[in-house]
Amino acid sequence: MDKISIIPIVGVALSLAIILQLGRTYWRLRHIPGPFPACITNFQRVGWVKTKRAHLILQDMHKKYGEVVRIGPNMVSFSNPEVIPTVYPARSGFPKGDFYVTLRPYTRGGGALHAVFNTTEEDLHKQIKSPIAPMFTPANTPSFEGLVDEVLTCIHEKLDENFIANSEIFNLGQWLQYFAFDVMGTMTFSKRYGFLDTGKDVGRMLGTIVDFMRDAAPMTQIPWLDWALRKNRIGDSIQRLFGKTASLGILGFVGKAIKERQELLSKGDFKVSDEKSGRKDFLTRFIELQQNDPKIPPWAPTAWTFSNVIAGSDSVGSLMRTTMFNLLVYPHTLEKLHDELRSAGVSRPYPKWSEIRNLLYLDACVQEGARMHPPFALPFERVVPAGGITILGYYLPGGTVVGGSPYVVNRHRETFGRDAEFWRPERWLESDEGHKRKLEQGVLTFGAGRRVCLGKHVGILEIKKLISFLVLNYDIRVVNPEKFELENSWFFFQRGLYATIRKRPDAVAVKNQQV
């Protein structure tokens, strides 16, 4: 048989193999409703993400097809919070899907960098999470208050200097983001990045994170394409050629900071941020943990610091903007919060954590902000273990990828009410503690189970401190709220929160208060 006659045979064989694979893929989940293209390809999901409004498209899919929807050949989405304990259990066995592999920055020397939030290997996750978990517990959260107060003092000064005197319209959302990043800079490196001091995106760090997520988000829907196009030497060279080096910029910043700190520690020249308490920043703790435990991989401090820089700052800033925007758009809730803070005798200008941590309406506002616009708005993907599971009457065989989008799940009307699309903090105060607990368990904003967000409690401290500070000290009015825009590129980016600001008549001047 000559070569020419073999070619058609090979072509037929390949075609049959593809048809059989497509048939097998279709057959496994044929009982799950969903759009027809989802049976054969994930490319329509890439298209959804590229619109930057995938959360709304997925919400429409659930309205059309029900609470369980097939959105890819092997991908199922759910919208009912009832499923959360099944898909995101406290035990191991439901590993993260390859979605998260695309969120690992690529380095030529060490390949893709694993971090607590993006590793899919459960043993590795335990290895790199366990050493740092005690730093983020509720009991340890108050230890960060002094660092937050340092940055509160800075934003207080800058708002008074730049915007109080002339009553000009300014980008409040941008300054909230600056605050979140400078807080994390202080916690991680013992110094602010300089966003508040300069009023600018220092070193274009914020822009770099946006670029990184915009590049990564479409790839999350077809992870093998990410490897083929970006996570190899050839793909990486092409990315560099076209200037697609966002992850390298972030890693470069982190690597430089770690190297400088290691040198200072080895010489004994580094001084802690708060010498009275002897409190160490995150970076020093990370380095010492790795040096004192040979089981911790040498790249762990880089991974931990990378997570702080990206997830620990942008997500908190997003929740600050969401909560503040809705308070301003619904002024009766703003005044209700102000009344609670004043009635509780909260310190001014800088509220104390002990005074605000258990305030009911403040907590309801923060809970509602986290529910309304979670910082991450694509499904949190998990792989069904061998033996399969049944959710809401639908059987999912082992190997199926399943997940819920926090944006969609958090708006489940049967759980959160017919007005679930709207801001109403009072929903968290209705009925009894059992009702509130049900709502809390139904919110997917911070994840759930064994992979719940590690920095949740620290983030809530930052948010409550800042919101209380702003509400107590300033009369803020939103300008053109219709310009407030949302972009879903895995991270939920927001733009256009403009406002005017003036001192409340009874506000305390910055110079009259010591922290």
Swiss-Prot record:
Please name the pathway.
Answer: Secondary metabolite biosynthesis; terpenoid biosynthesis
- Membrane topology annotation: Single-pass membrane protein
What Enzyme Commission number(s) appear in the record?
A: 1.-.-.-
Which Pfam families has this protein been placed in?
p450 (PF00067)
Entry's localization field: Membrane
Transmembrane regions listed in the UniProt entry: 3-23
Q: Family assignment?
A: Belongs to the cytochrome P450 family.
Question: What protein is this chain from?
Answer: Cytochrome P450 monooxygenase mfmA
Organism equals Annulohypoxylon moriforme
Q: What is the lineage of its organism?
A: Eukaryota, Fungi, Dikarya, Ascomycota, Pezizomycotina
**Gene, per the UniProt record:** mfmA
